[in-house]
């Protein structure tokens, strides 16, 4: 049996002043799963995203990506692991307006192992996967909100990551575009991509096959049947 795409073991994250943003969180996400992590504002979702994505280190416990314990890695190795195995999608897109859709997607390949001559081909392939094959040369500011988020998703998947972390991916979109983005994430998952959606919206969470709930930094529910405790 293959290792989980992502595993957290007794993870805690404390901030100065004794504020516990996460407390004893344990979970495992298997390859090709589609998972919602849901909670209200202040529940610890953003901190959990940062810890899962190795953007922040836990105060206690361990984070394993594809079976690799991140505690054993130095900063350079951790950055390399993140770039090779994790794709991020953020609510605010994080695109560069002066660049085309293709160029924005190519930025994800600048520091990886993809040869320069292959980067444009990889970017175009990713944009075709998200339905933007006709928008390759459009600059980011010329795209609609839904199209901009599709570019962001293409950038997240262009490295063929083990895991995609989507933080409130519909938060800046209207209902129709938000529905289209969720349909796209579900399609990518059906093609084998492991997707974790972080959201405050229970309607979004309820449409996904597995739901993990956070409250005050604790994992309090997991629809997979895994133990949850406060």
Regions found by a protein language model. Give the residues of each.
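H-loop (His-switch) and adjacent beta-strand-loop-beta switch element
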Residues: 211-224
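ABC family nucleotide-binding domain
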Residues: 4-214
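ABC-family P-loop ATPase nucleotide-binding domain
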Residues: 1-13, 221-230
């Amino acid at each position: 049996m293959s290792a989980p795409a992502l595993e957290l073991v007794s993870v805690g994250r404390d901030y100065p002043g004794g504020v516990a943003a996460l407390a004893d969180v344990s979970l495992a996400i298997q390859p090709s799963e589609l998972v919602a992590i849901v909670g209200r504002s202040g529940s610890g979702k953003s901190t959990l995203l940062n810890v899962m994505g190795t953007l922040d280190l836990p105060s206690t416990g361990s984070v394993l990506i594809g079976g690799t314990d991140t505690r054993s890695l130095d900063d350079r190795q951790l950055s390399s692991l993140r770039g090779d195995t994790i794709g991020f999608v953020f609510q605010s897109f994080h695109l560069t307006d002066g660049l085309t859709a293709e160029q924005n997607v190519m930025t994800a390949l600048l520091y990886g192992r993809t040869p320069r001559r292959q980067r444009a081909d990889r970017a175009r392939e990713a944009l075709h996967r998200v339905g933007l094959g006709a928008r390759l040369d459009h600059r980011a500011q010329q795209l609609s909100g839904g199209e901009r988020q599709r570019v962001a998703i293409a950038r997240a998947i262009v490295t063929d990551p083990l895991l995609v972390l989507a933080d409130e991916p519909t938060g800046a979109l209207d209902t129709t575009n938000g529905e289209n983005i969720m349909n796209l994430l579900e399609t990518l998952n059906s093609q084998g991509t492991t997707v974790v959606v972080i959201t405050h919206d229970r309607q979004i969470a309820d449409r996904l096959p597995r739901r993990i709930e956070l409250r005050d930094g604790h994992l309090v529910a997991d629809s997979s049947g895994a133990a949850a405790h406060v």
